[in-house]
């Protein structure tokens, strides 16, 4: 598959397919024409010696400092070097790759004044999978993601560190190996590379893809738990959910009915008990609400993926061109969205932990042994797996605190309100990793519980999942190091995202 970029129509599904299929990027001709026209405006500004922020002036507090024309290019290189103050662990390879795609896509809108050489350099890095090593910490989320994007830009000019073919190398060495010249930044181009929200948005895209997948994965795991506890299927009837009108709640209920169809372990209302606890009965309401959040997040991300979030922006109308200093780099819309994503994913973990507690608690699990222990007393069984899940969901509650309500002034109070969107993105991804492990714990415990109940009673669809995951996690016949089982399941769940489509 080839991913065609035009600056206007990029979707998360495009990104997901690109990552799954190891695709190449191509640029449509109309987008290249827009790039040429916006660059021509920059050249006229330089020729006419106009005063325009970031082209003929300094940056931030130095916006009133006029730069000597002989130093315009040096100004851009200095910008990249001085702003590359990222710290901490690097973003994942996937996030860094998506970051480049998103920055390229915004340049193709034709409002940034980039040269074709810059556009082609980004395309080359993407297609050759030269992945800049970009530290995660250091962005305030306005003026965009300055520090992370500066590390991306360093790689393009041959000064940064990159991953290429599995090895960490100097960018300059990789370019030399591939007979490619480092990019020679022209006027405005440093600013065009780093003024934007691509770090938070790229991490947000990856987080959305994985969060949506966790939502689907959580349903079949919940279906195993439901059967292990002889759950009541009546609560998933379509008419119950249709009268509330929340479409994602209706969708989850339909998928739960599908997962449970043909099971002899489920029960009907008043057959064993009149109603189940909320963690079983309200799966459509709880999980559906998370999917509603995911839909909102997807919409916001896709707006930003196709937005011009540079500063200043170049506009060309009939018989008129103009350059405007604005604030489209401010990450507040994405910060809000990613804070919401944290809540949606955290609740998948919260309800999963409560379900798995019902599987191991002898006061709640019916006729199952305490902690599913093969020999209660001598062997502890799943006792501490629940502790681990409780620890992760409690950590999520701290991480879910909204980053977007924080702000701090910078650049001598010129930049006096910031979004902290990249912090929201980073914390959100940690919540996703934690939640994946909580679901892995529920999976390990539910596999054992269904085995004790009798797998022959499982629905056909959940029986296939049981067999698939039993090849990863063997039966619990004695106490062992269960962290290996948990991590194996979590890793398997994660790997499947970029190999196949999400489980529906």
From Swiss-Prot:
There is a cross-link at residues 142-144 (5-imidazolinone (Ala-Gly)). One of its GO terms (molecular function) is histidine ammonia-lyase activity. Coiled coil: none annotated. Pfam families: Lyase_aromatic. GO terms for biological process: L-histidine catabolic process to glutamate and formamide; L-histidine catabolic process to glutamate and formate. Keywords: Cytoplasm, Histidine metabolism, Lyase. It catalyses: L-histidine = trans-urocanate + NH4(+). GO terms for cellular component: cytoplasm. It is found in: Cytoplasm. Contains an active site 4-methylidene-imidazol-5-one (MIO), which is formed autocatalytically by cyclization and dehydration of residues Ala-Ser-Gly. Its main location: cytoplasm. It comes from the Bacteria. Transmembrane segments: none annotated. Its EC number is 4.3.1.3. InterPro entries: Aromatic_Lyase, Fumarase/histidase_N, HutH, L-Aspartase-like, Phe/His_NH3-lyase_AS. Pathway: Amino-acid degradation; L-histidine degradation into L-glutamate; N-formimidoyl-L-glutamate from L-histidine: step 1/3. It is an enzyme of class 4 (lyase). The modification 2,3-didehydroalanine (Ser) is found at residue 143. Belongs to the PAL/histidase family. NCBIfam families: hutH, PRK09367.1. This is Histidine ammonia-lyase. It comes from Staphylococcus aureus (strain bovine RF122 / ET3-1).
